[in-house]
Curated annotation (Swiss-Prot):
Record text on subunit structure and interactions: The DNA-dependent RNA polymerase used for intermediate and late genes expression consists of eight subunits (147) kDa, (133) kDa, (35) kDa, (30) kDa, (22) kDa, (19) kDa, (18) kDa and (7) kDa totalling more than 500 kDa in mass. The same holoenzyme, with the addition of the transcription-specificity factor RAP94, is used for early gene expression.
UniProt keywords, alphabetically: DNA-directed RNA polymerase, Metal-binding, Nucleotidyltransferase, Transcription, Transferase, Virion
Domain of life: Viruses
Protein name from the UniProt record: DNA-directed RNA polymerase 132 kDa polypeptide
Range of residues in the leader sequence: none
Gene3D superfamilies on file: 2.40.50.150, 3.90.1100.10, DNA-directed RNA polymerase, subunit 2, domain 6, RNA polymerase alpha subunit dimerisation domain
Biological-process GO terms, alphabetical: DNA-templated transcription
Species in which this protein is naturally found: Rabbitpox virus (strain Utrecht)
UniProt keyword Protein biosynthesis, yes or no: no
Gene name of the encoded protein: RPO132
GO cellular component: DNA-directed RNA polymerase complex; virion component
PANTHER family: DNA-DIRECTED RNA POLYMERASE I SUBUNIT 2
Presence of keyword Transferase: yes
Catalytic reaction annotation: RNA(n) + a ribonucleoside 5'-triphosphate = RNA(n+1) + diphosphate
Length: 1164
């Protein structure tokens, strides 16, 4: 196949982003943003949050203050590696320590005198234990000198049970665009949040709502609960900006449709009516009166001046150091969007759009928790000082309060899946698929309670804003997470930025904006507002917007601002705004740059010749105008061409309309979808099902399972796939393997492999084909006295235990064997008994159906004995186990056939697996056939012309025609055997072979599709799911089999099962199942008068209803099932009377039988 052509340049550039980039510090691209996020927290942000100096209490008009100072923050890495942590059964944590000083400041004439109250130098080894993120190669951000393990990609935490934890990224609730809502007809709200910049600690949040009712325009107010006054939005804008109402009218009306202009005039007129209704109206007096009224309403302890300063100074925290005039112009720009959105709602980003949201990564989780717990810690110290002063008259702090910051509990809860009282942020890694290490940390989800609480959310639909940045295939197909969790595409990442970098970047952008002529950036009446993270900094001349944005983008790409991930969005469509985004949590990905109708990739002739020796960062430095990092907001408001091929087919005038061009379709998939093959050649649902099944595939070891007491299922003899995509290779999924190559035949086999049934060869299983090992953790807690008790009677359950009460190493556990000794004893109060001690076994038993070998035993002795046992079991495929291809052709083992029973080809080769051929037609998985063809072609020519082994690149999504792959296969066969005839060549290309019947040794009439394919074994194993049993425990209430395979449960015999047996006429079987056992048999006395079940009072059966009416009941004994009696009792308790009536039949009389003469016929 021809390589390095112009048409493949975009593909090669995309591949450069996927591979490691050591010059930029990128060693593993899929999880690099998570590593950076956590590294920023542990190295920088934690120091910023914990370093505090602020007043706790103030007295005597601030002349006396109790101060707290936290300093000397130090973070120490662990002395051991993650593997040692697993061996010891410990967590992998960093230790954070700090010094707390509490002192009293008194302002005197001589100056400020300081009196020490309390101090604590935190050197405790358990003060703050921060779970440490394990990065690529077992490295951590605190100690980069740790040794590398190439196949360990990390991205996990290890908790105190040495269990790996990974988490998804949650969509932040706060939106960067105001949320528009229709409350009722002609009534609307526009709510927005304002959050202080990252350099302002503690972080301040304010939430505001603008309300507008067409019938009451005078009440077009802005409000915020307890943090701001309720005031007319137009008058507030006038008060802050110090402009006239006519100025605001012209600003709101500029470049607006006529219907919006009409509404603008009505709102301004309504504001005028307010001013005219007040004699000698003064805007300052009007606002001051409202502030005073709010002061009285809240019963604030502050003076009126302090209250006013606090309210107005903290108005819009994200513009904390901005003059009030710019805040007023910002409010005018918000009102402008609001009025436009009323008439053109569909053109405004809705609240479900990813344009409006930032994303919480690992570092942000810990940052938020550290911030919240620090405020709780300081609050506890303040309360303790106040209580001590009230009770003892001294300013003192209990040492217990100083030594319990509370962060450990918060971090522990985070790793247990609880973040801000919402589930779903973290979960235990299941270990049955190596891809989970990548897919879970790269998934983005909404808060579950966001959807439950808000009825307006429609996040369950695939939102248009997710296009290109999220994988459209790797989404949950069923369950509560449908539409709530999405997987990032391979080119997507999430931005991170340090506080110092944020401030420097903001300063450079402001300097660049102010380098323009002053009048051109002061068009506050009719210009385009320029905002940096929603903070208004200027308003640009409308005639300069295109030149400004173009020049800004060029300077950004050239590194003028020192950050290549800055987002600049030109919002047109009458909303008129230039938005510059520099914060963390934004979705970004690279795009090819189009400048003045030219694809910049095409105007760089040196790029193609130098590309092989360059990294992605080299391309950004030496060819800065070829690729641009674009965030999702900039992408949404830009014109983007979907492919280079389509762009080149356009006319020159059409090309000038575009700003960016996308990479090929394979880069729109996520890493899990990239493990599939040719999903665009299959039907749509196969891609979604294929992603779900690929994540359920059992892969090779992701960690040292013998030293880690954790659950896991691992493939014993994995093979690297031959047909792969570039993303599969660079993410190391291919190198870590998740299947084996098997030889398949598409045919029917004696009618056994119907539907999803597959036939698997016995000798293939015996040779270790798709063999797995199951590691299972068994954990029990035993009271110390129970563990020390000795058994009085020998128990078979304790046959595998040592004398120390623990299970023996290398013992084979069977169902019913005890894990550890647990004997409960009780003393009988019987003076005549010789031995009044009784004991009984309450140990937890091994419950699996298969035997397992004890690999490791771990014991912790505290007030209880904590025993953790790791068992291992090799498990070969059996009937009922599930397998699949990478095209979602799932099959279940229906029959294990001996090699002598299977058809064979001319070389005597028999298929390892036989699959029903009709499944290809019904599921339309053409790419499965292509994979077999390419794998077979590789076997004919596994090396390229340089003698190097080369896998076959078959991306998950591609624009390559099937004929191209057929031509590739043809060249491979012609190279290895040029003397093939056309028919033989065609048979080899299309993998068609003549197979011979094993019974007659005659060839089949038609050729069979026969060839190798990469096959996966799924975690759905028969022995893990079987719950059928003959005897066992029953529930007390309904006396049916209890639930849960681990608890020895079975399948309940309910209505549907009963109906099935009735259909078969198996009356005796129903009676036997429901009645005949001793537990289910129930004698019931029924009153023939009223049909009630009789009650037993003091051993006498009586009908309560008839006895109250002084009637003489006639009770009849019937036998029924216990569950029937429970049902009747429950119905009666709910007020539903079920009457048991007896069938009244008249007596039957039969005529005498005819006499039968038994004499021999010859005597008659």
């Amino acid at each position: 196949m021809k390589k390095n052509t112009d048409s493949e340049m975009d593909q090669r550039l995309g591949y450069k982003f996927l591979v490691p980039d050591p010059k930029a510090g990128v060693f593993y691209r899929p999880l690099h943003f998570q590593y950076v996020s956590y590294s920023n927290f542990i190295l920088h942000r934690l120091h910023e949050i914990l370093t505090v100096k602020r007043p706790l209490l103030s007295f005597k008009n601030n002349t006396e203050r109790i101060m707290i100072e936290i300093s000397n923050v130090k973070v120490t890495p662990p002395d051991y590696s993650p593997i040692i942590a697993s061996i010891k059964g410990k967590s992998y944590d960093a230790l954070a320590t700090f010094t707390v000083n509490i002192f009293k400041e008194v302002m005197t004439k001589e100056g400020i005198s300081i009196t020490k109250i309390s101090s604590y130098e935190g050197k405790d080894s358990h003060l703050i234990k921060i779970p440490l993120l394990i990065g690529y190669g077992n490295k951590n951000p605190l100690d980069t000198a740790k040794y590398l393990v190439p196949n360990v990609i990390g991205g996990v935490f290890i908790n105190k049970q040495s269990v790996e934890k990974v988490g998804i990224n949650l969509v932040e609730k706060i939106t960067t665009w105001p949320k528009f809502r229709v409350v009722k007809p002609n009534s609307f709200t526009f709510s927005f949040s304002s959050v202080s910049p990252p350099n302002v600690l503690p972080t301040r949040y304010r939430h505001y709502k603008i309300s507008l009712d067409i019938s009451q325009l005078e009440a077009s107010n802005i409000s915020s609960t307890k943090t701001f006054i309720t005031v007319n939005i137009v008058l507030l804008s006038q008060y802050l900006s110090r402009v006239s109402l006519e100025f605001i009218r012209r600003s709101l009306s500029y470049d607006m449709p006529p219907e919006v202009v009409y509404l603008v005039n009505a709102i301004i007129d309504s504001a005028k009516r307010i001013t005219e209704s007040i004699t000698d109206f003064n805007i300052d007096t009007y606002i001051n009166d409202l502030v005073e009224a709010e002061h009285i309403k809240q019963k604030s302890q502050l003076t009126i001046n302090e209250f006013k300063y606090e309210m107005l100074h903290n108005f819009l925290p994200h513009m904390n150091y901005t003059p009030d005039q710019l805040k007023g112009f910002y409010m005018i720009s918000l009102l402008r969007k609001f009025l436009y959105c009323i008439y053109h709602t569909s053109r405004y980003p809705d609240r479900d759009s990813m344009v409006c949201h930032r994303i919480l990564t690992y570092g942000k989780y810990f940052e938020t928790l550290a911030h919240d717990e620090l405020e709780n810690y300081i609050g506890n110290i303040r309360n303790d000082i106040m209580n001590n002063h009230k009770n003892r008259g001294t300013y003192a702090v209990n040492i217990h309060v100083l030594t319990t910051p509370g962060l450990n509990h918060a971090f522990s809860s985070l790793l247990s899946g609880k973040f801000k009282k919402s589930d779903g942020s973290y979960r235990t890694h299941p270990h049955y698929s190596w891809m989970q290490n990548i897919s879970i940390p790269r998934s983005v989800g909404f808060y579950p309670d966001q959807v439950k609480i808000s009825k307006m959310f429609s996040v369950r639909k695939y939102h248009p804003s997710q296009y290109l940045y999220f994988c459209s295939s790797d989404v949950p197909e069923r369950g509560p997470q449908v539409g709530l969790v999405s997987q990032l595409s391979v080119l997507s990442s999430i931005t991170n930025i340090l506080t110092s970098e944020y401030l420097d970047l903001e300063k450079k952008i402001c300097e660049y904006i102010r380098s323009y002529y002053k009048d051109d950036i002061s068009y506050f009446e009719t210009g385009f507002p320029i905002t940096i993270e929603n903070a208004l900094v200027a308003s640009l001349n409308p005639n300069m917007i295109c030149d400004f944005v173009t020049d800004f983008r060029r300077r950004k790409r050239m590194g003028f601002f020192g950050n290549l991930e800055v987002g600049i969005t030109l919002v047109r469509d009458h909303m008129n705004e230039i938005r510059i985004n520099i914060g963390a949590g934004r979705l970004v990905r690279p795009f090819l740059v189009v400048d003045n109708g030219e694809l910049m990739m095409d105007v760089c002739p040196e790029l193609e010749s130098r590309l092989d020796d360059m990294t992605f960062s080299d391309i950004q430095k030496e060819f800065p105008h070829v690729i641009e990092m674009v965030d999702i907001e900039q992408f949404t408001f830009s014109n983007v061409c979907e492919s280079v091929q389509k762009f080149r087919m356009m006319s020159k005038d059409e090309r000038k309309q575009y700003d960016l061009c996308d990479f090929p379709a394979e880069f729109r998939d996520g890493y899990v979808a990239s493990s599939l093959v040719g999903i665009n050649h299959n039907s749509g649902p196969r891609a979604i099902l294929g992603c779900a099944q690929a994540k359920q595939a059992i892969s090779c070891l992701s960690s040292d399972i013998r030293n880690k007491i954790d659950n896991g299922i691992h493939l014993m003899y994995p093979e690297r796939p031959i047909v792969i995509s570039k993303a599969l290779e660079t993410s190391k999924i291919a190198a870590n393997c998740f299947g084996q190559h098997v030889t398949i035949a598409l045919m029917s086999y004696k009618g056994i492999n119907q539907e999803d049934g597959i036939i698997i060869k016995k000798q293939f299983i015996q040779r270790g084909g798709l063999d797995i090992v199951t590691a299972k953790k068994h954990q029990v807690e035993i009271p110390l006295e129970n563990f020390n008790n000795k058994e009085r009677d020998r128990s078979n359950a304790y046959s595998k235990l040592e004398s120390n009460g623990l299970v023996r190493l290398n013992a084979f556990l069977e169902s019913g064997d005890a894990i550890a000794r647990n004997i409960s004893s009780r003393t009988l109060e019987d003076d005549f008994a010789r031995d009044n001690q009784i004991s009984f076994d309450v140990s937890e038993k091994y419950t699996d159906m298969y035997k397992s070998r004890v690999e490791r035993v771990q014991v912790e002795l505290t007030d209880k004995v904590k025993v953790r046992v790791l068992t291992m079991k090799e498990r070969r495929p059996i009937l009922g186990d599930k397998f699949t291809t990478r095209t979602s052709q799932k099959g279940t083992v229906a029959y294990i056939a001996d090699e002598t029973e299977l058809p064979y080809d001319e070389n005597g080769i028999t298929p390892d697996v036989i699959i029903n051929s009709t499944s290809i037609f019904s599921r339309k998985t053409i790419s499965m056939l292509i994979e077999v063809i390419l794998t077979a072609a590789y076997s004919a020519k596994p090396y390229n012309n340089k003698g190097e082994n080369r896998p076959v690149c078959f991306p998950s999504s591609n624009e390559t025609s099937i004929d191209t792959y057929m031509q590739f296969a043809k060249q491979c066969y012609e190279h290895s055997n040029p003397k093939l005839s056309d028919e033989e060549l065609s048979d080899k290309i299309f993998c068609e072979k003549i197979l011979y019947d094993p019974e007659t040794d005659k060839p089949y009439a038609s050729k069979v599709f026969f060839g190798p394919i990469y096959y996966l074994r799924l975690r759905h194993l028969t022995q893990d799911k079987a719950t059928v049993r003959c005897r066992g425990k029953k529930t007390k209430l309904i006396r049916q089999a209890n639930e849960g395979r681990k608890r020895g449960g079975g399948i309940k015999f309910g209505e549907m099962e009963r109906d099935c047996l009735i259909a078969h006429g198996a009356a005796n079987t129903i009676t036997e199942v429901l009645k005949d056992s001793e537990e289910d048999y129930q004698d019931v006395y029924v009153c023939e008068n009223c049909g009630d079940i009789a009650a037993q009072i003091k051993g006498i059966n009586t009908c309560l209803r008839c006895s109250k009416l002084n009637l003489s009941p006639l009770l009849t004994k019937i036998d029924t099932t216990h569950v029937s009696k429970v049902f009747l009792t429950q119905m009666n308790a709910r007020g539903v009377k079920v009457k048991l009536d007896f069938e009244r039949r008249p007596p039957s009389f039969y005529k005498p039988l005819d006499k039968v003469d038994l004499k021999p016929s010859f005597l008659v």
